[in-house]
């Protein structure tokens, strides 16, 4: 499988996404250390981490085929476990709400 060009390209794409997420995470950490409000960047990083984790483990599972879905395979375990990243500490929808609020695009409540 490793000689397949599609797999090479897919792994390169995933590595690029991981590095972009790492940069976002470092930027959020730098803001926090500097005493600035890092809520927006931290929420973006958490949202992206959950989604990217699912994308990476899904791709690995696809490469492994049926064997990747077997209980004793570490890919199967990672596939199941990574789902908690998007749930624990605030679901994706909560992170999106926080980001929208900080962007100033969340609709305000109307008072009639």
Where are these regions (language model features)?
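Alpha-helical interface subdomain recognition
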Residues: 1-112
